[in-house]
């Protein structure tokens, strides 16, 4: 897949897509960014960089691109900002941004009747009833507001926008800005009381939270993400409520309603995980396991600035491997991507995801840089050529590492740091392991008594998978070694300025001694890498349920295909 928020109207963009041939293109804006900004003079600036001004004109542009990409066999997923509103309810020139759209540009022939006359009633509220707002981005000199997802009128607005995008030929949506703030509106007060009533008995509310009469209790805060050091049991219930109710709204708008319009509508969320940040980050950190990704087609998790540079001398590979394995385990081998904000190490970003069940890649497929474009195309065509080993594959492991979600539920993040530490040790030792949540009974399995062994440097990561058709084990090797760009004056590692600074250093002489399933017979072994057009046959020895082989030299990504007798 590819995703772009800028320069997607460049003349080179569509030719690049035709070369790389991604299956999914995240293109276009159909939520609050579009409706807040398309009619303004800020239409072509951050965040959405809309190609033309005007709702009708810009909508027609997206519709034309949807039709074009469909003729090339690509699915188009639109970005859908669910609540972040840019505008001013009033100014010397009247309403601006979203509020101007709602008053003057809501076309009932296009969107149906307005859910409510006054848009201020749909906003998140402070304790005194005023709208929560900020002047953070300063887009067009306007403020930012947030709609309350729990407000039924706002859900009608989102549904109107969902329908309009479906009419324009979109294949699905990725919901972003999927937050809840410290909203104290009547809907949040009511729904949080209902949540507590279902979860706790009256006596428990008294003893645990000092709530004497829930029906009459008015909360002075209902927080969502917050500083873990300032967390309390009640605040974590507020966060859990926020995440559950957000998921319920997502399901209502995109799953139930969206798929009533288009039964195969692709539905995804854009979330944030950083370096496994919890309580202060991760939109699903307290979400119950049975709701985690339920009915969603793929996930986007942003690692932000946590994994877009290397400091090899300190063992920092700038990787998202551990995050990827956590997401894969929670999402049960369904597709996901990591938004690494990586514009330099393009090969590694693609390889890391491919090796761990992900869909390469997130942001910053730099199609205007000739070298980046060449590399992206080469690696995407490699994935297409060997589609059978990636599509619908499942992880193949010899051990599990438990992720301490139950500790997070208690507000104890010490075990998360221990998880990071242990995870890195296992990765450095090249142990084939999955990540499972400790909230799932029986999810863990003991490590094999004599596990597979890989003689490889610690700058290489190893994983394994089974293709959907079976009869094969695929071992993935990702090499992070490189010539690093100079650090800054303070000694901080540099993320680099583009693919010319990726500078990977090939790895040589990796040997392996791996376990194969009991009773299996190896028919042959092949080695593939994006830098070579054809597979290479590898010599091996097999005895007593184990296979030994050596890898040829490769640059960043290599896969060993161990083919088994059916």
Which residues make up each language-model segment?
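Amphipathic, non-transmembrane alpha-helical secondary structure
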Residues: 10-19, 63, 67, 155-167, ...
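Flexible loop residues that form catalytic
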Residues: 29-30, 170, 178, 183, ...
């Amino acid at each position: 897949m590819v995703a772009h928020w800028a320069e997607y109207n460049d003349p080179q963009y569509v030719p690049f897509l035709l070369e790389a041939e991604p299956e999914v293109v995240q293109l276009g804006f159909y939520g609050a960014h579009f409706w807040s900004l398309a009619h303004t003079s800020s239409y072509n600036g951050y965040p959405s960089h809309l190609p033309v001004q005007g709702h009708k004109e810009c909508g027609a542009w997206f519709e034309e691109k949807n039709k074009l990409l469909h003729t090339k066999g690509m699915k188009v997923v639109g970005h859908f900002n669910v609540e972040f509103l840019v505008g001013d309810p009033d100014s010397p020139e009247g309403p601006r941004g979203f509020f101007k759209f709602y008053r003057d540009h809501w076309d009932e022939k296009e969107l149906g009747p307005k859910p409510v006359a006054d848009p201020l009633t749909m906003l998140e509220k402070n304790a005194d009833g005023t709208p929560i707002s900020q002047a953070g981005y300063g887009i067009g000199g306007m403020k930012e507001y947030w709609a309350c997802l729990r407000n039924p009128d706002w859900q009608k607005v989102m549904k109107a926008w969902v329908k309009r995008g479906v009419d324009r030929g979109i294949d699905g949506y990725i919901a972003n800005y999927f937050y809840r703030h410290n909203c104290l509106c009547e809907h949040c007060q009511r729904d949080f009381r209902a949540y507590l009533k279902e979860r706790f008995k009256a006596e428990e509310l008294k003893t645990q939270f000092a709530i004497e009469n829930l029906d009459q209790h008015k909360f002075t805060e209902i927080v969502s993400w917050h500083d873990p050091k300032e967390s309390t049991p009640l605040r974590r219930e507020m966060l859990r409520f926020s995440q559950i109710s957000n998921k319920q709204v997502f399901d209502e708008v995109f799953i139930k309603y969206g798929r009533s319009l288009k039964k195969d509508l692709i539905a995804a969320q854009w979330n944030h995980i950083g370096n496994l940040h919890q309580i202060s980050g991760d939109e699903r950190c307290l979400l119950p396991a049975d709701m985690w990704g339920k009915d969603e087609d793929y996930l986007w998790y942003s690692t932000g600035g946590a994994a877009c540079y290397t400091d090899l001398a300190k063992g920092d590979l700038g990787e998202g491997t551990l995050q990827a394995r956590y997401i894969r385990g929670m999402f049960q081998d369904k597709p996901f991507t990591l938004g690494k904000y990586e514009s330099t190490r393009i090969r590694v970003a693609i390889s890391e995801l491919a090796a761990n069940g992900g869909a390469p890649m997130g942001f910053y497929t730099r199609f205007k840089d000739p070298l980046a474009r060449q590399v992206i195309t080469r690696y995407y065509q490699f994935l297409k050529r060997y589609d059978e080993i990636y599509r619908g594959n499942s992880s193949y492991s010899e051990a599990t590492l438990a992720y301490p979600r139950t500790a997070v539920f208690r507000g104890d993040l010490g075990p998360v740091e221990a998880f990071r530490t242990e995870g890195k040790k296992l990765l450095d030792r090249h142990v084939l392991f999955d990540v499972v949540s400790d909230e799932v009974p029986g999810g863990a399995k003991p490590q094999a008594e004599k596990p597979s062994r890989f003689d490889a440097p610690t700058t290489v990561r190893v994983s394994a998978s089974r293709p959907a058709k079976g009869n094969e084990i695929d071992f993935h090797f990702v090499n992070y070694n490189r010539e690093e760009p100079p650090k800054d004056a303070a000694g901080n590692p540099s993320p680099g300025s583009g693919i010319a600074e990726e500078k990977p250093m090939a790895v040589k002489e990796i040997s392996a001694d791996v376990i194969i399933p009991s009773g299996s017979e190896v028919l042959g072994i092949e080695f593939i890498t994006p830098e070579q057009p054809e597979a290479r046959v590898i010599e091996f020895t097999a005895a007593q349920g184990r296979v030994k082989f050596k890898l040829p030299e490769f640059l960043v990504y290599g896969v060993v295909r161990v083919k088994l007798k059916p």
